[in-house]
Amino acid sequence: LIFSELVLEITKGSDDPYSIAIINFEGPKNINNQISSIVSNDLNRTGEFRILRDNQLLSLPKNQEEINYDDFKLLNVDFIIMGATSQEDISNISVSYEIYSVNKKSKIRTSTIYGIPNRLRQLSHYISDGIYEEVTGIKGVASTRLLYVTEQMINSRSIFKLVVADADGENEQVLLQSREPIISPSWSPNSKEVAYVSFETGMAKVYIQNIASGSREIVLENNSQISSPSWSPNGNFLSLTLYQDGNAEIYILNLKNKN
């Protein structure tokens, strides 16, 4: 078997993207450089924005009073993003940001997000989503997470991994590693647990696993083929596909009594 890495590169987005000037935030330089970079990459990845950074701008205002809107109009900028970061101690950080409309010549949003330094990527993703929603009117997805299965050949044997990662592919967390297939991963409604089918014991079993603790339990096992666990909106039931006598049938599993 030959495996290759699949890379999808967005080379063209919207024909009329929003033009946004992201001015480096005030505060600790190392932190602000990371935030600006992550937010810029998040918005670029949507294909709906054209990002301008400090070295592309005619002026670098530090507050609303210093904004010369004509400087930004000359560059066809639609929105200006400014902000400031404050880190009072090693365990707490806050980021305030403002969005200005060049057309309206006014501030259209002010937000403050609190977090911890080692979750700076997640905090930055929330800022990206706030900007995206304010500009487009649609909720952003930068702060959401991906759930997927990978397969890798090691010593001529397949190794399967169930992985959770940020929407940009960073912060990968391996939930399960097995020499047997893992299929049909599914988020719980509160995003704290995942359901999936694993063949690690030689037969298909449905597991529910807590992402934070890693603890898991078997919620269904039988001699039939099982696939496609899917949560009910309230998180109390799973729908599953069972293959019996050559037929695929959909069943509902009550997670409280396992019936």
What residues fall within each predicted segment?
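Short loop/turn segments that connect beta-strands within beta-propeller blades
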Residues: 103, 166-170, 210-214, 254-258
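Sec/Tat signal peptide C-region and signal peptidase I cleavage site
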Residues: 2-4
